Amino acid sequence: MILSLNERPQEAVAVIDASGTVLKYGELLAFSEKIGALLPQRSLLFLLTENNVGGIAWSIGSINSGNVPLILNAHIEEGLFHNLFEIYRPPYVCVPSSMADTLQYESVYEYYGYTLLCTGMEPCRVHDDLSHLLPTSGSTGSPKLVRHKYENIEAAALNISTFFGLTSSDRPLLVLPLYYTMGLSVVFSHLYVGATILITHQSMTDKAFWS
C-alpha cells in the first residue's frame, strides 16, 4: 500500500478534473484492488495518460496493485511509441478509450475513460523494488527510462509534504503532465496528506483555464 492511502477518509475527494469528474480515496483504493485482480502480479504495462481523473486513477492504481506502469504521453508520436514497444514488449497497454480502436489488441477492461488492452507479449521479470517507469525526456520517446522504487515514492512524498507544510485542506492545481517526474511528485505528495488534487489538460493560455 503506497502513500498510506488506506488511512485516508474513504469519502474524501482525492481528485477532480476539468470535466468535473470526481475520484474519492475509497474509489481509488477499490480501483487498485480491481487492477490487482485483472493483471498477473508485477505486470509491465504501457500507460498512455492525459491529465484527467482516469490518468491519475490508472497511474496510482497500477502502482498500488503491485504492477509496473511506464507512464507516457497519450499523444506520443506513433513511431516513437512503436520504438518503445519493440524494445520493452509490454504484455499490457492502457490508453484513453477514444484511442483503443487504433491498436489491434484484445480489450480487457474499460474504466475511468481508459481501456486496458492485452498485447499477447510474454511477461518479463521486473525487479521487486521497481514501482514505475518514466521517460527521460517527457514525450520524446527516448528508449532510456527513469526507474523509480516504492521507497522513493514514500520518501519523496514525506519530504515534499513536510517541507511545504502540505495538509488535507490543500487544493493544488496540476497542469504538469503525469509522465513528468514533477507532475507525479505533485500527485504523490498531496495524496500522502489526503488533499484534493485539481487536474487539468488545459493550458494557462486557454480561456477555459480561467473560467
Name the predicted role of every residue range:
Residues 21, 79, 92-130, 142:
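ANL superfamily adenylate-forming
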